[in-house]
């Protein structure tokens, strides 16, 4: 619990240690912010709806020697999200930014987008009650995808051709777009994602690699086009000047510029029966939640039996176990290499293996995964 809750939309430039004082002044003249303050009382969350506000806050924190840990979400927060925020808060010398943005470009089914649970008041209450997030970024769609700027596009090769990528065409292209845009807006030092969406984690890891390569390419092009380019054509007159510019970043207002954060994975959080926590669980009945616990119970069979069965036998037994659960419709059960997601045909060909599942129940699609070995 650090300061009052302030609604900053838009926010004035916040400088140095005056950020909280200026924010307090700002909220006093915002009727909407005042109502929100009365609703939620004291907490430590600054709320921003535009890039100028969050970027001003981040610059202020950086001037004070803090780094930024970023937890992007689509809202409908649960204990798994809060655990990521808590892990972020325990990183050294950080300020924690959580975002809520339901990204339309990663939904291949419009009905799924419409049905996605949204409860911003509850989300804010959870963050406020926890008291570990320093800022909540809730951008509008035009802030994330400005009409005047085309979106960057990404290809993730084999990572997007299996499981979620195969079943949800265009899903990971949308994930790449939104993560790239949010990282451009937030400029974080750390990016925290959950283990439950493990395939997404690998996709984002590859996205960061591509952004790093893109930034190096842009830096080289900038040097090549410099009017001060020397005989070497690299944009520098001499070795001393070249050395000074070796780590020179591009201007942060360029659409394609990104700070490349350190990627951190948080462990999957489960209820007392093993069901992986998910925003989609809110759409299940109590009976549906009880049945859904059988997903993780079945996946654990692979960890217990992999030394005694072939990969194909393991998958078939899990399918039989889930077929006995009423109202289940299994979309896939897949054994995959933990690093490449290549299908596992023989245990000995892989140093680390996970098993993945996608199952429908009560019209809700649930995914889960767990380590088989090591």
Feature map (PLM): residue ranges:
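Leucine-biased recognition of intrinsically disordered, low-complexity hydrophobic segments
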Residues: 5-8, 14, 218, 250
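Cationic, low-complexity basic patches in intrinsically disordered or flexible, solvent-exposed regions
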Residues: 14, 22, 27, 225, ...
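Nucleotidyltransferase catalytic core that binds NTPs
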Residues: 38-226, 231, 235-327, 336, ...
């Amino acid at each position: 619990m650090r300061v009052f809750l302030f609604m900053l939309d838009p926010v004035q430039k916040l400088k140095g240690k005056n950020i909280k004082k200026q924010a307090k002044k700002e909220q006093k003249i915002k009727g909407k912010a005042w109502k929100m303050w009365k609703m939620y009382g004291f907490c430590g969350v600054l709320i921003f709806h535009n890039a100028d506000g969050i970027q001003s806050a981040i610059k202020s924190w950086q001037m004070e020697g803090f780094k930024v840990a970023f937890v992007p979400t689509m809202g409908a927060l649960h204990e798994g999200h809060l655990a990521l925020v808590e892990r972020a808060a325990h990183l050294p010398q950080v300020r924690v930014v959580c975002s809520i943005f339901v990204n339309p470009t990663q939904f291949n089914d419009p009905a799924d987008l419409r049905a996605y649970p949204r409860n911003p008041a509850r989300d804010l209450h959870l963050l406020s009650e926890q008291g570990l997030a320093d800022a909540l970024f809730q951008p509008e769609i035009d802030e994330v995808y400005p009409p005047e700027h085309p979106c960057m596009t990404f290809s993730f090769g084999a990572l997007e051709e299996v499981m979620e990528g195969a079943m949800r065409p265009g899903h990971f292209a949308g994930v790449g777009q939104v993560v790239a845009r949010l990282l451009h807006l937030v400029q974080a030092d750390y990016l925290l994602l959950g283990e439950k969406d493990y395939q997404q984690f690998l996709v984002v890891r590859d996205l960061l690699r591509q952004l790093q390569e893109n930034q190096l390419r842009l830096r080289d092009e900038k040097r090549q086009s410099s009017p001060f380019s020397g005989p070497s054509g690299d944009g520098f007159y001499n070795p001393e000047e070249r050395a000074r510019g070796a780590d020179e970043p591009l201007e942060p207002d360029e659409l394609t510029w990104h700070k490349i954060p350190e990627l951190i994975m948080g462990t999957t959080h489960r209820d007392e029966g093993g069901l992986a926590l998910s925003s989609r669980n809110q759409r299940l009945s109590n009976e549906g939640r009880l049945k859904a616990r059988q997903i993780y119970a079945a996946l654990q069979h692979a960890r217990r039996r992999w030394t005694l069965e072939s990969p194909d036998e393991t998958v078939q037994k899990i399918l039989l176990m889930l077929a006995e659960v009423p109202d289940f419709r299994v979309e896939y059960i897949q054994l995959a290499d933990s690093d490449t997601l290549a299908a596992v045909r023989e245990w000995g060909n892989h140093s680390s293996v996970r098993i993945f599942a996608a199952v429908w129940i009560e019209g809700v699609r649930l995914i889960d995964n767990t380590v088989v070995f090591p």
